[in-house]
Structures are given as C-alpha cells and as structure tokens.
Design a protein with these regions (language model features):
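Active-site glycine-rich loops that stabilize anionic/oxyanionic intermediates
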Residues: 24-27, 89
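Alpha/beta-hydrolase active-site loop signature
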Residues: 26, 50-54, 116
C-alpha cells in the first residue's frame, strides 16, 4: 500500500539518496520533524505515516513484513530506487524488516530505540483499550476523547500524544 507522505526538497542540492523517516507506534509523520528540519539542508526528506497511522490507509494486517512492503510500494510510487531509512521504535523494526524484503532499496539504515528481537511484553494493552473505547464511543471532540481515555490511562502526556491523531469531526 502507498503510504501518506510529506516530501521536502533539499535546500542544497547534492547527489545524496533521499532520507525516509519512519515513526513509531501510535505516531505520525510529524514525530520525526526535528530530524527532518535538520536534514533537509542537504537531503531530500520523505516523512511517512505508517499503515493504520496518521492519514495512511487502514488495514487489518499489522505486521512488520506488511509495513516493509508498504515502504517498497511507497518508494515505487515516488519512483525512488534507493533511500536512506531512519526508523524510530516500530519504524525501526519496519526498516529492519525491509532488509530481508528489499535490501537493494536501502542505501543506509538507522534504527533508533529498538532492537531486532521479539518483545513479548504487552505494555500497550491499556493504550489499545483507550483507543478502542474512543473508537466505540460517539466522541466528536478532543475533549470528549480525552475524557474517555482518562478512564483507561493515568499519564496525561500519553493521552495528549494519542490525541494528536484524533480528528475533531466539527472541523471536517
């Protein structure tokens, strides 16, 4: 699947490969914006919303091979043969999965805050419960969604991070 992207053109044109920035779980393409701002001087930057995140398509399949294929599909749609990938957390595992699927598409790879191992800890169950509760409710505003999330989560910072992806239907 082709992912939603934000593309930025390098201010100083070099022959460097473009850099694809891949966010972590519950994130969006904005999450690595600080890196994008620093790197765009010398590199074309592509920030992606991974599947089921941000404005990218939704799909019941959510695994690393599928996410790696999405990156290939996105490169194909943009007519990019090879890129440098920087992935954070879930994005890091997705770009590591890309090494098995399409190693020829990778110029360089940076995985941040993740290792290529299985994580058996179910540390996001409360977050999924909060997101599901909002999805199943008739919440139409960020305030309503936040109130529902507070029934499942105690960390206000996590709630505010999750609300970045909430669409206030009054603004549509």
């Amino acid at each position: 699947m082709k992912l939603n992207i934000r593309a930025q053109t390098a201010q100083n044109q070099h022959n460097n490969s473009p850099i694809v920035l891949v966010h972590g779980l519950f994130g969006s393409l904005d999450n690595l914006g600080v890196l994008a701002r620093d790197l765009v001087n010398d590199h074309n930057i592509i920030q992606v919303d991974m599947r089921n995140h941000g404005l990218s398509p939704r799909d019941p399949v959510m695994n690393y091979p599928a996410m790696a294929q999405d990156l290939v599909d996105t490169l194909d749609a943009l007519q990019i043969d090879k890129a440098t990938f920087i992935g954070h957390s879930m994005g890091g595992k997705a770009v590591m999965a890309l090494t098995a699927l399409a190693p020829d598409r990778i110029d360089k790879l940076v995985a941040i805050d993740i290792a290529p191992v299985d994580y058996h800890v179910r540390r996001h169950d409360e977050i999924f419960a909060a997101i599901n509760a909002v999805s199943e409710s008739d919440a139409q505003t960020r305030q309503q969604a936040a109130a529902i999330m507070r029934q499942h989560l105690n960390e206000e910072g996590v709630i505010q991070f999750l609300l970045k992806s909430f669409v206030d239907v009054r603004l549509l």
